[in-house]
């Protein structure tokens, strides 16, 4: 049985219930079972570390993945969704080092690798429960039970296989390179890792002198921001083609050499120095200089402490003289190698250990952390007279992505994968991938690939997949292992785990007769593992070989833009190297989520709300929709604002929920009042003649087509705004314009058609929105599905909305002409609303006229066809349509598009702009028709000029109008006040107050109430308004409206006093309807005879319980009251003809059709008595003339709108009802007989009231 929908909803609480429902029915796994035989859609999930809690970046990427994979399932695919965990590498080790106070390799050696890795393993899944809880709570369907972890032996074995493939292809080598080095983690990083975390920092800025051996009074001046590298200086480098100068420092009396372009870096005024000589840098080549320190003086034997030349030196900063520390700078290393200052087999001049501290060679600073040693080195240079100037320099500098500490550049031996020879193939494969947004492929990722460098894949660490190379001591003999079986065979040992503690001790016999081969000490960079994820997660090629190859490359992946230098890159490098093809076909790249102030989100700064608290407060659907409906899905940044999530709930989810609630309310009303059970069957729904039904159905089908196209193109950022717009269309337009139809005010048949339309649209919208808002759509669907005719389901499994396939576009329902017509109507209404807002005239107050001016007659015809909606929505009496601008003083005005024309016309723009503004109305009309115009010699088109209407209020007697326009239409609204309209506005205010009280009591429309009122105003104004608008108020509130007092027997629901335009109004709602309808049984009549059609009412008894009609009497009364002469009448209820034996009282409240011919066509049946009426209550006399009732009913009109009752007629008819024609009567509005009904009381104010009949005594009675 369909459930009533509460007015108030806690979205988070309802989502928790949906989670229980999914869990109880194992919906996700069932979903996978159902789709097992469908075509596969392959999705790779990038593995996060579980050593930290999920943040908004994870939530965003997870939401994108969930939306696309849900969509793929609903599009007819089978989608395996396995969660993955990155378990190795620096993030884990760094946490352990901090916890255990480990400073370097010596501490690990003392502990032992086995114990160290045991500690790492223990925290790998530290936050896995929180991850699972948050991901599940967000509504993401992903398989945690069948996850993959990079620490699984099967995963690690596949990583070995990947590496061996590369090794066998000659893509692996060992080299010594200057690399980014994390002193906090004690390991080198790859170039793409070092590019992930740049910060602006202040470093020392020092100018140091290097006296020439040939002339110690002349010094080269070098500049550096890393004083700690100066103890390792082996050379200086200049640019051979730049002009250098020898100058005399006036103050110091010394001679210095530097580039002429950088003199300003040292001297503020030219008078501070004298240029003695100019020469190219090439002339400095080979000159010897005095070293700063003697730590590596032996290197002088190999040509150290010499001036070298290279074009990498620039004169844009520094002095044009660069100090060379070849083991701490990549360019330094290359140049010194070129000039044989160092050789491949040289002992490295690298006096810095893995912790970033000076080793014993640097005796003055041994044990000092290099950055801390800067100030001490500067002090020593000053003492030695080698410091020319010192300050600070702000620049962007790389930090370790894990420890957030500054990196240094340091030469270390590492294992590399050759990437540089692959660049062309990488670019080619990148072009085969579809990127959303496109610019990421071309710009960010493409540019990165063009500059790709060989990848350092080894880390001098412990917790990771060991590099499977067994080597001789001299590294001449190398065996690369590609599987567990291979290692077991070569080592003769059974293996159960592949971590260092399990295999480091294993040796392999040498084929060359050398000592047994031992494994190299390094482990893989964890990015190598995640890049191997497509193969390793399925243990390829050891298992699932066919399945993997059939499903590779992946159909879809998604991550943040930072992964262009991370996971996206490593995936592409490995897939290109292994298979020569890209690893994925489609990729969505999201931007970064920042704090509301634009800064990076920081736990330390606490500058963002906790994601769990946001979900608990607003729900996951609101958070999901907020993130997806933002620039972040276009790879732009998003400043996260809590109020944005709140607004999604308020502006999208609540209105959508209320439309659904309104639908359910009216399904209940239909069943209760009309005894019609609503069941939807899309195969038997009749085409509605109502234009708004056709419009909203067409709009939905157009949306479906757009949804299919854009989702297939992975453009979520275009889909969500359209879905959100449709919620607005549905709630603020369709439901609003059809409230009366949906509430049954236009008859049962039309009500059912409107409900069918709304049901169809609600269900389709739920199916489209299901991937985006999985909870709310499930909540609605669980109730809506109970209204689907089982005969139409065709054995589909309908337990969850997420089992349903997406609806297909029904082209036959698309009606673009109707969509355009309604769009034009909406524009008119919106323009009218702007005018009302501008003049602060509430919509409750009716206005006389709206004039719509449009140059397109077809547009005006469209607007004419929807005129009644304009009248209702803008509350106007009359709509006037015209193409005559001049009649109303309307002229055209032009505004240039500054951006478009300014860019195109440049210097000529100003003159063209002025000329555009001077164009006459006639010229602009010609431009409006032709679409082009020549201004100042430039041909301009529609995209260059914006036309607007202007309104001259003083022209042509139009002073009563206010105007507003858009590009196509201008609307004039007559805002002149009119008393009858003001009165109606007051009546609407009364209705508004009553409905608000209803809402306060959480009443639904089918709850029966009585409304009592007490109005206090000057001259009884408010009383008069209420009395004269009683019918209007009742038609809206569907409840009896009575003046005070409130009977003591009534059950009061709520009572409230309010102010209304200076009047006091007290309203009381009581439970139950004090006037449930006519006291006597009745039927509504629809009479079709003699070529005319009439409506009216017949009372089947009067007074109650007496004077009952049979069929013969009914026909006689019809002939008399409705003037039907000379016709043989037949009476029908629906399609069934009434027979003589029919009990007419059983048909009370129904509508009968009286015809002089065949069975009538179906008619709508009003839910209340068709004519106005009042009830009679006899107070103090027994009925006469054998009549037994004391309660009766009088019709104030019959037929409908005819034969209105007068006061005299009321007295006469009351006496007639009770057989008291010979008695004098007095009539009262209350039982206490204090409010007598006199001739000056309008009869229409008595509608639906009870009139109390008092019989005056006769002489005989006395």
From Swiss-Prot:
<dbReference type="GO" id="GO:0002161">
    <property type="term" value="F:aminoacyl-tRNA deacylase activity"/>
</dbReference>
<protein>
    <recommendedName>
        <fullName>Isoleucine--tRNA ligase, cytoplasmic</fullName>
        <ecNumber>6.1.1.5</ecNumber>
    </recommendedName>
</protein>
<feature type="short sequence motif" description="'KMSKS' region">
    <location>
        <begin position="600"/>
        <end position="604"/>
    </location>
</feature>
<dbReference type="Pfam" id="PF08264">
    <property type="entry name" value="Anticodon_1"/>
</dbReference>
<dbReference type="InterPro" id="IPR002300">
    <property type="entry name" value="aa-tRNA-synth_Ia"/>
</dbReference>
<keyword id="KW-0963">Cytoplasm</keyword>
<feature type="binding site">
    <location>
        <position position="603"/>
    </location>
    <ligand>
        <name>ATP</name>
    </ligand>
</feature>
<dbReference type="GO" id="GO:0005654">
    <property type="term" value="C:nucleoplasm"/>
</dbReference>
<dbReference type="GO" id="GO:0004822">
    <property type="term" value="F:isoleucine-tRNA ligase activity"/>
</dbReference>
<dbReference type="InterPro" id="IPR013155">
    <property type="entry name" value="M/V/L/I-tRNA-synth_anticd-bd"/>
</dbReference>
<dbReference type="GO" id="GO:0006428">
    <property type="term" value="P:isoleucyl-tRNA aminoacylation"/>
</dbReference>
<keyword id="KW-0547">Nucleotide-binding</keyword>
<dbReference type="Pfam" id="PF19302">
    <property type="entry name" value="DUF5915"/>
</dbReference>
<dbReference type="Pfam" id="PF23567">
    <property type="entry name" value="Ubiquitin_IARS1"/>
</dbReference>
<keyword id="KW-0436">Ligase</keyword>
<keyword id="KW-0067">ATP-binding</keyword>
<dbReference type="Pfam" id="PF00133">
    <property type="entry name" value="tRNA-synt_1"/>
</dbReference>
<dbReference type="GO" id="GO:0051020">
    <property type="term" value="F:GTPase binding"/>
</dbReference>
<dbReference type="InterPro" id="IPR057033">
    <property type="entry name" value="Ubiquitin_IARS1"/>
</dbReference>
<comment type="function">
    <text>Catalyzes the specific attachment of an amino acid to its cognate tRNA in a 2 step reaction: the amino acid (AA) is first activated by ATP to form AA-AMP and then transferred to the acceptor end of the tRNA.</text>
</comment>
<dbReference type="InterPro" id="IPR023586">
    <property type="entry name" value="Ile-tRNA-ligase_type2"/>
</dbReference>
<dbReference type="GO" id="GO:0000049">
    <property type="term" value="F:tRNA binding"/>
</dbReference>
<feature type="short sequence motif" description="'HIGH' region">
    <location>
        <begin position="48"/>
        <end position="58"/>
    </location>
</feature>
<keyword id="KW-0597">Phosphoprotein</keyword>
<dbReference type="InterPro" id="IPR009080">
    <property type="entry name" value="tRNAsynth_Ia_anticodon-bd"/>
</dbReference>
<dbReference type="InterPro" id="IPR033709">
    <property type="entry name" value="Anticodon_Ile_ABEc"/>
</dbReference>
<feature type="modified residue" description="N-acetylmethionine">
    <location>
        <position position="1"/>
    </location>
</feature>
<comment type="similarity">
    <text>Belongs to the class-I aminoacyl-tRNA synthetase family.</text>
</comment>
<dbReference type="GO" id="GO:0005829">
    <property type="term" value="C:cytosol"/>
</dbReference>
<dbReference type="InterPro" id="IPR009008">
    <property type="entry name" value="Val/Leu/Ile-tRNA-synth_edit"/>
</dbReference>
<dbReference type="InterPro" id="IPR001412">
    <property type="entry name" value="aa-tRNA-synth_I_CS"/>
</dbReference>
<dbReference type="GO" id="GO:0017101">
    <property type="term" value="C:aminoacyl-tRNA synthetase multienzyme complex"/>
</dbReference>
<dbReference type="GO" id="GO:0005524">
    <property type="term" value="F:ATP binding"/>
</dbReference>
<keyword id="KW-0648">Protein biosynthesis</keyword>
<dbReference type="InterPro" id="IPR014729">
    <property type="entry name" value="Rossmann-like_a/b/a_fold"/>
</dbReference>
<keyword id="KW-0030">Aminoacyl-tRNA synthetase</keyword>
<keyword id="KW-0007">Acetylation</keyword>
<feature type="modified residue" description="Phosphothreonine">
    <location>
        <position position="1058"/>
    </location>
</feature>
<dbReference type="InterPro" id="IPR002301">
    <property type="entry name" value="Ile-tRNA-ligase"/>
</dbReference>
<feature type="modified residue" description="Phosphoserine">
    <location>
        <position position="1049"/>
    </location>
</feature>
<dbReference type="GO" id="GO:0005737">
    <property type="term" value="C:cytoplasm"/>
</dbReference>
<comment type="subunit">
    <text>Part of a multisubunit complex that groups tRNA ligases for Arg (RARS1), Asp (DARS1), Gln (QARS1), Ile (IARS1), Leu (LARS1), Lys (KARS1), Met (MARS1) the bifunctional ligase for Glu and Pro (EPRS1) and the auxiliary subunits AIMP1/p43, AIMP2/p38 and EEF1E1/p18.</text>
</comment>
